[in-house]
A protein has these predicted regions:
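Amide-donor transfer/coupling interface in amidating biosynthetic enzymes
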Residues: 460, 465-467, 506-509, 541-683
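Glycine/proline-enriched, intrinsically flexible loops and inter-domain linkers
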Residues: 1-484, 497-508, 639-640, 668, ...
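Short, well-ordered, mixed-charge alpha-helical segments that flank or form enzyme active sites
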Residues: 34-35, 231-233, 254, 526-530, ...
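Cysteine-nucleophile active-site neighborhood
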Residues: 478, 482-570
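Active-site glycine-centered loops adjacent to acidic/histidine catalytic or metal-binding residues
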Residues: 302, 522, 652
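Short glycine-/acidic-enriched loop or helix-start segments at secondary-structure transitions
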Residues: 13, 432, 486-488, 528-531, ...
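Short, basic, glycine/proline-bearing loop/turn elements
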Residues: 197, 487-495, 612-613, 619-624
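Catalytic metal-binding/acid-base residues of hydrolase active sites
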Residues: 229, 482, 524-526, 591, ...
């Protein structure tokens, strides 16, 4: 990042950067003389006039040729609906990308309103990214929605038509999520082959931009930013003409809907028109939005390459709800209809045409044929599984542990407003979410950015951290990827920091003399277990006989919501929970697989130190990767110290809030922070 500062602000800026553990250097000065000069080792290597820079160089001209084009509809192979459905679901532009998506943290910031995949089974792909605006204090219902549109098979035939429809598709997806298209703006990502001097090559971006411009004028929506590249050529290979439209709009979390079917017995309707008939299209947008706001439409899907058939399958897969198509529906199930919307309605409203009804079985019933969609799901999920795997162990249950506490320890000193110390190491990214969770529970939070730019800075950070722990009642190690999880594993810098004698003494004083609490989430849990604070309650030299957290069994990062069961409420952190309570919790980690000797695990279970376990939809502890994302032994998600005051867990319990994760069912708030605050208040 580069910044231009007034001379009197430079020292303050450098000091602020240092407090955030950032390197900042003065690299240039603005002068009155209108020339750009650069020197290297005392030698001037650049000396250009401002007037020359403002000219942008010499004028250039080229010729663009746009041939007549004719877009042919995409045809899926097969003579029967079953054959076409199988071909469609195996198409690279339609098949599941879940294994790719789960490599990216989708819940950071505790503001995600719609998860990338929704429904009970988290399998319906969400078409619109929706998140609350970030606020450090308080709550908000204000969200932003973002959706994209792009079809390379159309762009390759007609850059103009492909770009026009990209805009239409991106806006239609916003409407299907409950956003008003009249408040939307656009941004474009463009990528074309190297132009050279060929007029037909220049004609492709020319036609694409005309198509996008016409769509903007028709919808009265402006593009306010974008990025382009014309370097998509390698030797004799060229990228297809590419213009991806992103539509963005503000809205309210309470008015957002998600695309997964909600219940059997609802009617399914199709609203469509010629996408170039702007009056009809915008009338459809207004009518659908009105029905969504009235609660008559509970899920909606913007049709794409796979048409109605793709929409029915993807809307149904999240909750395994099938479709019975009406006998009198005569539409083409596989026709691409950009701008069309498939609606799940709670009542038979006068909007578009009726396609059919939702049914409780995971099937598609059409013209007397009953298609088992489980086999189709295998095609859909399996296409890219060898490239972006997200499937592993299935169906294996494991032992459930249970330990119910009847009484809880009392802190040595009652505190009216308990203070949590939250250290931020290089790579930590959850400190704001964690501090907000503490404050929402009635406590106070104090954040310290650990500075490791110099040896002296590390010494100062240790001294300051020790002082802050001395006045705190809790230590919370937030999640992230400290040190980039290098070298060869997570939390090494955190553990080295806490093994410093001053830090070790401060932690032991908090836990052993003042009866304080300590929590480690994700990266923080990794630090706690490598320090020995869990399961032993103190910082020790660990050995290969100690439990640890290692790389996920699937061999990559996992991000999703999981179900965890309270196995023991012995910890003050879990005093407001009951054994067998189940919560839906966000996870995001690459090293979360708990392993340890069986004898030790049995000992921990007997002492009530196994706090939480991953469970399936039936509440059974499981090794199934759909529910146990890292392959943890005995499905263990969290453990505690012997007295329960220290707890470590992989799930991001701090990532909760009103209106979040609306497309995945389940109770998300474990009230861990409320439990800790009440314990320290002796309530």
């Amino acid at each position: 990042m580069a910044g231009v500062l007034a001379p009197e602000d430079v020292d303050a800026f450098l000091a602020a950067a240092n407090r955030e553990n950032l390197e900042a250097t003065v690299v240039a000065e603005v002068t009155a003389e209108p020339r750009l000069r650069m020197t290297w080792k005392g030698v001037t290597i650049v000396d250009l006039s401002r007037e020359f820079l403002n000219s942008n160089g010499a004028e250039k001209h080229t010729t663009a040729s746009v041939p007549d084009d004719d877009v042919k509809p995409y045809e899926f192979a097969g003579d029967t609906v079953t054959e076409k459905l199988a071909d469609m679901l195996g198409n690279l532009n339609i098949c599941s990308k879940q294994g790719l998506s789960e490599r990216f943290d989708s819940t950071i910031g505790a503001a995600t309103v719609l998860m990338p995949f929704g429904g009970k089974y988290q399998l319906t792909p969400n078409q619109t990214m929706v998140a609350k605006l970030p606020v450090l204090h308080g709550t908000t219902d204000t969200v932003s929605g973002m959706a994209y549109g792009m079809h390379p098979e159309i762009l390759s035939q007609s850059p103009y038509e492909g770009s026009y429809l990209a805009v239409i598709e991106s806006v239609t997806k916003l409407v299907c999520a409950g956003f008003d298209y009249k408040q939307a703006y656009l941004t474009f990502q463009e990528y074309f082959e190297r132009m050279g001097t060929d007029p037909t090559r220049w004609g492709k971006p020319f036609a694409a931009l005309l198509g996008a411009l016409d769509a903007q004028l028709d919808l009265n929506i402006a593009a306010i930013g974008g990025k382009d590249s014309m370097s998509g050529t390698f030797e004799k290979m060229d990228v297809p003409p590419t213009l991806c439209s992103f539509a963005i709009a503000p809205g309210k979390a309470s008015e957002v809907i998600s695309p997964e079917f909600k219940e059997a017995g609802h009617s399914i309707r199709l609203v469509s028109c010629d996408p170039h008939d702007t009056a009809a299209l915008t009338a459809n947008y207004d009518a659908v939005l009105s029905a969504i706001r009235a609660g008559k439409v509970v899920s909606a899907w913007a049709l794409g390459l796979g048409g109605v058939a793709e929409g029915l399958f993807k809307m149904g897969i999240g909750n395994q709800i099938g479709t019975r198509i009406d006998d009198d529906y005569d539409g083409n199930l596989f026709a691409q209809q950009i701008g069309a919307m498939l609606l799940e309605c709670t009542e038979d409203i006068d909007l578009g045409v009726k396609v059919g009804d939702t049914v409780p079985e995971w099937v598609l019933e059409y013209e007397g044929e009953r298609i088992d969609l489980t086999a189709m799901q295998e095609i859909y999920e399996g296409k890219l599984d060898k490239v972006f795997s997200y499937r592993g162990h299935t169906g294996e249950t494991t032992e459930k542990f249970s330990y119910s506490a009847e009484t809880y320890p009392v802190p040595a000193v009652k505190t009216v407003k308990p203070l949590a110390f939250i250290p931020v190491f290089p790579g930590t990214n959850c400190e704001y979410d964690t501090a907000r969770a503490v404050e929402r529970a009635g406590g106070a939070a104090e954040i310290l950015v650990i500075n490791n730019l110099t040896p002296e800075a590390i010494t100062q950070s240790i001294a300051e951290a020790s002082r802050m722990i001395a006045r705190s009642q809790m230590i919370v190690l937030p999640g992230g990827f400290s040190g980039g999880d290098e070298p060869d594993g997570s939390a090494k810098f955190i553990t080295a920091f806490f093994r410093n004698p001053a830090m070790k003494d401060a932690v032991h004083d908090l836990l052993q003399r003042r009866d304080g609490l300590m929590l480690g989430i994700c990266n923080g849990f990794q630090a706690l277990i490598k320090l020995g604070l869990v399961p032993y309650g103190e910082i020790i030299d660990t050995s290969d006989q100690c439990p640890t957290l290692t790389f996920n069994e699937i061999g990559r990062h996992q991000s999703m919501l999981v179900r965890t069961r309270i196995a023991s409420n012995k910890s003050p952190w879990l005093s407001r929970c009951k054994v067998d309570d189940i919560h839906t919790v966000a996870i995001s980690h690459g090293e979360g697989r708990f392993v340890g000797p069986e004898a030790l695990i049995r000992q921990l279970a007997a002492n009530g130190q196994i706090a939480t376990q991953y469970v399936d939809a039936d509440g059974q502890a499981t090794m199934d990767i759909q529910y146990n994302p890292n392959g943890s032994a005995w499905a263990i998600e969290g453990i505690t110290s012997p007295d329960g005051r220290v707890i470590g867990k992989m799930g991001h319990t701090e990532r909760v809030g009103k209106g979040l994760y609306r497309n995945v069912p389940g109770e998300t708030d474990m009230k861990m922070f409320e439990s800790a605050v009440r314990y320290l208040q002796n309530q």
